[in-house]
């Protein structure tokens, strides 16, 4: 964490250079954690060019990769400005990451959309009526923390976020993206 914080990032290009190899690796492993397989070379090509060649996989994988790219673009200026974590940022990160991927009928029937809290009764997470309050409390709890236990606080944030499970889908990817943003 200290090494990361020691970098003198003055402009978006500095951050892009620093994270050049990290971004595709993060997206690749994020896909694996979600049970989706896409070759690392394809992910690297997509992050380098914004397109892929020789791809015959699930188009949803490309939508998810595009969400990762768009989310990085959205967060880049906020990382440079060292903006605190806010609930509105959580909602926007989720909206960007999952844009175009809420296609299953039960999401649509329940009126659930990317960037909106869960509305249906789920077997996991906080009750739908409590999600906003619990997420606000979590964000207040960790926002602005800059002490010596940053990694532990980031892990705590991720664990509590997943426990709240604020969205119908995309909680894992959103939580991992926000944990990295927090660090």
Residue ranges of predicted features:
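FIC/Doc superfamily catalytic core
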Residues: 1-183
């Amino acid at each position: 964490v200290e090494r990361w914080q020691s970098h003198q990032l003055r402009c978006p290009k500095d951050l892009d250079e620093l994270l050049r190899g990290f971004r595709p690796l993060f997206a690749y492993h994020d896909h694996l954690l979600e049970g989706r397989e896409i070759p690392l070379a394809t992910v690297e090509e997509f992050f380098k060019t914004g397109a892929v060649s020789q791809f015959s996989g699930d188009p949803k994988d490309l939508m998810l990769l595009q969400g990762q790219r768009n989310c990085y673009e959205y967060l880049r200026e906020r990382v440079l400005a060292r903006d605190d974590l806010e609930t509105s940022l959580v909602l926007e990160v989720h909206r960007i990451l999952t844009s175009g991927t809420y296609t299953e009928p039960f999401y649509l029937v329940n009126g659930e959309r990317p960037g909106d809290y869960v509305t249906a009764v789920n077997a996991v997470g906080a009750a739908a009526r409590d999600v906003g309050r619990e997420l606000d409390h979590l964000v207040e709890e960790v926002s602005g923390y800059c002490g010596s236990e940053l990694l532990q606080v980031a892990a705590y944030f991720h664990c509590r976020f997943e426990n709240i499970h604020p969205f119908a889908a995309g909680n894992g990817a959103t939580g991992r993206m926000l944990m990295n943003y927090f660090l």
